[in-house]
């Protein structure tokens, strides 16, 4: 059993008081009202005939969490109970000969395991690959590096088209990837499911600002199921995709109905490094029990397309949350203003460790061309909301939307400071590298208490240890066109939609439970 506590998780959430997603009640006739209790079971007894029927157990699904406004994002305890490593073991034990199992691992989760076991990320990749292919019967183990490059590329194209539409200015930008529906500025990142749930449940007026690009997890899940289903000639139902991710809300993301194709989810199950360690303990598996030198990355990944890079150790420049801001800033500087060298062109303003602003200045006039920010942790997200208005939730959303529109389209203020064009938003303080599912320091590390900033920096050092890389835009475009030859397919599969969750304003418990 995985045990969680407030000090283990960032922004830890118990199920809300209003977490009472109603179970459908079947109306009974007057002669069917008696309830009989026997041990741990409950039975309904018909008065006239004496017929006994065992009552089912009421339960809450992940879809219920997505449709309920009782919690701000989700309750980690619910996520653990409904999608855990026990599910992995159940499917592994039930695997049939024609089933095809895939593990996709995020670089942040890999770095967490590397720091925890004092290994390099390369050694962790080899170890996890060996465990899952040899011990757990998985067919393929990949990371989400390549799918992240697809997401970054799509997000940059979306931003540039939105910026041009909002500014109605002539630039050197010429998109060869079709036209996407422009977003009002600032464009807000969408790879963090905790942030997305927060917007959908409490500030739905901001949905038009949210990037529609799928996260790397969902891009990879769809791509891998499509490819192996076609390549192996098997149904998507026979392909089971497991994700190893740094946060629990990724379980919710995988459960969204938007990510279902042919009644099959693109990602079937999500676990975190904490849960993986518990799984390995049940099988008495540790890195020390394996000869890592005898393993090779190239020994697996059968049938993968030649254009799909299964493992990327080098990371993109920028944040350890995927580098969205850095990539989009670099891409937009070239695409919009024909600026190739950003050296001495970026002014950085740090409000706190989790709120940093970046300004791109003109090499000729010194004026601000683009202004972007990273915003991590609900404290900063709440501050953003509080600075705009503190009325009712719908009112706050409308005021915030109006203010943000004015911010993005109005000329510079008297101080010459331009308003934000793009924000990389993550729910966890420190971003994805400090996700709630990441491992704490080993018990032998007495210098740390909980997940501290120092420990987070150590995990981040492992994340960037192999070095940095630039996205090969031409290779990514070629891969996308090979996989999705038409623009309509690209829009359908690489983008998604968001949905406002109706607040139960007539429920006094729900009203009292607002954040």
From Swiss-Prot:
Record protein name field: Cytosolic Fe-S cluster assembly factor NAR1 homolog
GO biological process: iron-sulfur cluster assembly
Pfam families for this protein: Fe_hyd_lg_C
Organism in which the protein naturally occurs: Schizosaccharomyces japonicus (strain yFS275 / FY16936) (Fission yeast)
Binding positions ([4Fe-4S] cluster 1): 19, 65, 68, 71
Family per similarity comment: Belongs to the NARF family.
Gene Ontology molecular-function annotations: 4 iron, 4 sulfur cluster binding; iron-sulfur cluster binding; metal ion binding
GO cellular component: cytosolic [4Fe-4S] assembly targeting complex
UniProt binding sites for [4Fe-4S] cluster 2: 192, 247, 428, 432
Superkingdom of the source species: Eukaryota
InterPro entries: Cytosolic_Fe-S_CAF, Fe_hydrogenase, Fe_hydrogenase_lsu_C
Function summary: Component of the cytosolic Fe/S protein assembly machinery. Required for maturation of extramitochondrial Fe/S proteins. May play a role in the transfer of pre-assembled Fe/S clusters to target apoproteins.
Transmembrane regions: none
Swiss-Prot/TrEMBL keywords: 4Fe-4S, Iron, Iron-sulfur, Metal-binding
């Amino acid at each position: 059993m995985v045990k969680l506590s407030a000090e283990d998780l960032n922004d830890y959430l118990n199920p809300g008081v209003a977490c009472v997603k109603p179970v459908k009640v079947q109306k009974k006739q007057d002669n069917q009202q008696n309830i009989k209790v026997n041990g741990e079971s409950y039975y309904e007894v018909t008065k006239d005939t004496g017929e006994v029927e065992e009552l089912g157990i009421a339960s809450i699904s992940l879809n219920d969490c997505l449709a309920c406004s009782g919690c701000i994002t989700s309750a980690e305890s619910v996520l653990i109970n409904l999608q855990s490593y026990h599910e992995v073991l159940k499917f592994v034990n039930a695997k049939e000969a024609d089933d095809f199992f895939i593990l996709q691992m995020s670089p942040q989760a890999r770095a967490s395991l590397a720091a925890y076991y004092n290994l390099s990320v390369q050694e962790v990749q080899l170890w996890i690959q060996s465990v899952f292919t040899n011990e757990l019967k998985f067919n393929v183990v990949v990371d989400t590096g390549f799918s992240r490059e697809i997401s970054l590329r799509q997000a940059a194209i979306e931003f540039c088209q939105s910026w041009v539409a909002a500014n109605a200015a002539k630039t050197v930008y010429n998109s060869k990837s079709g036209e996407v529906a422009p977003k009002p500025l600032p464009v807000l990142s969408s790879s963090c499911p905790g942030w997305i749930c927060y917007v959908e449940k409490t500030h739905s007026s901001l949905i038009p600002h949210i990037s529609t690009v799928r996260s790397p997890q969902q891009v990879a899940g769809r791509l891998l199921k499509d490819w192996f289903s076609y390549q192996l000639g098997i149904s998507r139902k026979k392909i089971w995709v497991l994700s190893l991710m740094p946060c629990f809300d990724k379980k919710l993301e995988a459960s969204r109905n938007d990510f279902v194709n042919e009644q099959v989810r693109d990602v079937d199950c999500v676990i975190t490094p904490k849960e993986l360690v518990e799984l390995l303990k049940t099988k008495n598996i540790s890195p020390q029990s394996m000869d890592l030198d005898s393993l090779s990355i190239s020994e697996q990944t059968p049938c993968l397309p030649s254009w799909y890079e299964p493992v990327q150790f080098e990371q993109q420049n920028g944040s350890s949350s995927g580098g969205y801001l850095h990539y989009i800033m670099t891409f937009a500087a070239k695409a919009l203003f024909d600026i190739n060298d950003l050296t001495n062109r970026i002014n950085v303003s740090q409000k706190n460790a989790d709120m940093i602003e970046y300004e791109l200045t003109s090499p000729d006039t010194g004026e601000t061309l683009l202004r972007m920010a990273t915003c991590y942790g609900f404290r900063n997200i709440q501050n953003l909301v509080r600075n705009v208005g503190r009325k009712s939730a719908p009112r706050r959303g409308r005021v915030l939307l109006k203010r943000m529109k004015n911010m993005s389209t109005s000329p510079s203020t008297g101080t010459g400071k331009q308003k934000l064009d793009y924000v990389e938003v993550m729910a966890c303080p420190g971003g994805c590298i400090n996700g709630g599912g990441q491992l704490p320091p080993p018990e032998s590390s007495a210098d740390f208490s909980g997940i501290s900033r120092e420990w987070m920096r150590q995990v981040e050092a492992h994340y960037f240890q192999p070095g940095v890389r630039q996205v090969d835009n031409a290779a990514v475009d070629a891969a996308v066109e090979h996989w999705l030859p038409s623009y309509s397919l690209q829009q359908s599969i690489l983008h998604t939609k968001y949905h406002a969750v109706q607040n139960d304003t007539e429920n006094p418990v729900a009203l009292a439970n607002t954040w």
